[in-house]
Amino acid sequence: MTNRLLCAFLFIFGLLIHPPAVLPGQIIVDSEKQFQLAFQALEKGEYQRAVVEFERFIHFFPEDEKVPRARYLIGVCYLRGKRYETARKFLEEVYRAYYPKPVSGKALFLIGESYFRQGFPEEAAGFFKKVIETYPQPELKNAAIYRLGWSRMQKDKWQEASKTFNLVEKSSRLYPSASDLSDKALMGEDLPYKSPTTAGVLAIVPGLGHVYTDRYKDGMVALLLNGLTIWAAVEAFNQDLNVLGGVLVALELGWYSGNIYSAINGAHKYNRKVRADFRRNLTDSLNLNLFTSREVPLGLALKIDF
């Protein structure tokens, strides 16, 4: 009996000296689990939730080796969510904070990618060039060359684009696509083209400039509208309705100048559409998963009190 009491006493005393690691009202947050929770939200396309989870990770584990990557992936979330200016803000911070580490090179590339996706290929090209000049990592460098080729195609610089695609190394996974695009880029020089100047000159005869740009319906409308207005103005003056005639002449000047402007603008639209359709039918093989691949180092643990 005495032995049992002694054992019970020692057991209770041991609990008092070494309490449980987790007390009621506490949870353990593991750095690796927290990071993976954020990463899984990113993979599912839940970008705002992923941002919150990455920020929570950074807050609780500011010394963790994955903090640079977490900050970088916040920028990726905003990029994928098409919040390009916000993405650039975070990516620029990563670039400045961790230069010249590889994560800064990826951040610099994605700043260029944000401009490319926004439709600013000239601005994007500057960042891709900087990646090529600064970062020797083959995958990153070849991706920047590949995207620089696309940026030049967006500006209708077909020969420059072709030469750029040829710079992608044969060892790169992008090489087959780059080789194909190098040939197809040159086809852009042979795409149909409508001269805006010619369209404007032809529009001296109302509607003819529209016909030149294959806008036959608009050409017919322009011809009828201008023709009827001119006829009505002439009839008004013939019947001594000078005020009405003056109003009709003023209207016709507006219709006529609008007809010329519309024909010139139509030529520009035609050229843009033909080239955009051509580019749309080309295959872009750049996979941005290259920039969000998993890394699995061991993590720390942190207790949080409710």
Model-derived segments and their meaning:
Residues 192-269:
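Hydrophobic alpha-helical membrane-anchor/signal-helix detector
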Residues 30-61, 76, 80:
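Alpha-helical segment of the N-proximal tetratricopeptide repeat
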Residues 46, 66, 83, 103, ...:
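Residues in the short coil linking paired helices within alpha-helical repeat scaffolds
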Residues 70-73, 107-110, 147, 181:
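Canonical tetratricopeptide repeat
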